[in-house]
Amino acid sequence: MAHDEDDRRNLELFQALLIGIEWEYEVARLEFIDEIQDLMGRWRGPRPNFHQLFPRAEVIEWLLSDALNTMREKYQPGLRFIKFVLNSGYRDRPRFENGEYVVARTTPIHRAAIMRERHAVSWDMAIEALFEIYDRYDLNYVDAETGLTHFHVACMSNCVYAARQFIHNGLSPDYYPDERIDPPLHLALKYHEFNFERTPMIKMLLRRGANPNLATAEGTRPLHVICRKFYDGAELAQQFFKLNDELRQSVDCNVADVWGRTPLQWAVASLSPELIDLLVYRGADWDGFVFPDQSLILEAYERQHRLRYRFGFKLKLAMRARLVDEYLYDHDYELTASDATKIMELLARHRVFNVLSELEEQVLTDLELVENARNVQIKQGLTLYDALRLRPKELERRLEPRRLYAFWKHKNLYQLNTFGEMWLCEKLLCEKMMRGFMRSWGLASFMELNRYVWPFEAAEVFVDNLMNENLWSLCKAVHWREEPADEESDSEEQQQPDAEQPRRGSFDFRD
């Protein structure tokens, strides 16, 4: 009885809040969503009947859209409101005009997809709830401005049930009516996050006939999408190949887009040694490999930019750069100075370079950090403290990039006490482990810049006194050529290494 009385009071209060609101004004609607937050939290019985309380269906649609604007706020009041509407039993009623249903209609689902933040699982939860409200899977609503449809939103938001229902109602798993929107499989792969599970969506689409080699208008295949990814590209590619093997479908590893860019070039541009290895194992043409051009490197930077402030990203980027360099070297592809400068540019834009002497002073004078670092083992006979105090040349002799990369992947830096300690150690390890690569190319560039008139020993002394950031600036001054942003690379010579460029040769730090 007490609960019934509470429910009655809640309903009366809810109805009272509706009085006098001018629904045409967004400010008024947002105030309403804010005012009913406490009420929604204590509501235990049947929810109010939104169909009865809101005779104008567009008001509910406005409120659901406005709720999305509060998704970034603390406690996500928008998500709470959407679920409250869903639990009330409210379902959208399609519009019927001139004897047919209207599908050219922008819904809150479209708006949620456009506003959606990557790595934000709450957005997927909101979209999933909205699909239960807009539950007519025989009507694939399309946003006229963007070309985005409900089916595409389901694929990019991991709403497997909704996507399956659209296919069941006759949509092709390769539905691609508009060049402005990628095909379903491309979207599922693009929005596959390294810390959220997207494999069921990819599996569902492939098993229902999605083409693993489908090209967009720009020639982008699903494998291109995978190879653009920084964090989970190798793992996702492994799953993708495995699923297609089970379905007895082949995946073309050598296909290029309209700009001539192959999956292997994207893997190199993304500095993913595991992915490069997998592609070569799967048949990627290594003999015809051309190092990615500057535009591809910079596009990779733009895709990684949002990860720059994530702890461990810079060390991972630096180690992957070293591993890609070694992988290319071991497969008889020798970097040119221009190639190396492109890698340096990517590292510099992510602010990987620091002042070594300042970092060493900060780290080695912190007694608590030193004590903690002594207890962190990188490998047998080498502690984190050893790595932090050794000179770069000695550290490279005792610690292979692959071993440090494995150390990072197992999150062993988290054994330190504070994030401050971890950030300092990450920066110092980056600076030291990149030193050999930077020095060898800096020396080659310095000799070229001075037309080889300096004695080699004198040049070595000069270069040894430069920081990694200075060496990058030196290489960039000699070898970096800005490319027009809109210019398409339509000739082979634009991608071919310059035959006159110096190669590492006698400057190789491996010698």
Language model regions located:
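Start-of-repeat signature of ankyrin repeats
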Residues: 105, 146-147, 180-181, 219-220, ...
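Ankyrin repeat domain, specifically the short helix-to-loop turn at the C-terminus of the second helix
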Residues: 86-94, 128-138, 164-173, 203-211, ...
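Hydrophobic, small-residue-rich alpha-helical packing segments that form membrane-like cores
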Residues: 155-157, 163, 169-179, 187-196, ...
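Ankyrin repeat A-helix N-terminal signature
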Residues: 111-123, 153-159, 187-198, 225-234, ...
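Amphipathic alpha-helical repeat scaffolds of TPR domains
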Residues: 61, 102-111, 148, 217-220, ...
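Helix-turn-helix repeat elements of alpha-solenoid scaffolds
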Residues: 74-87, 118-129, 233-238, 243
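Ankyrin repeat boundary signal
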Residues: 100, 141-143, 173-177, 212-215, ...
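Cullin-RING E3 adaptor/co-adaptor recruitment helices
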Residues: 1-95, 100-101, 115-116, 266, ...
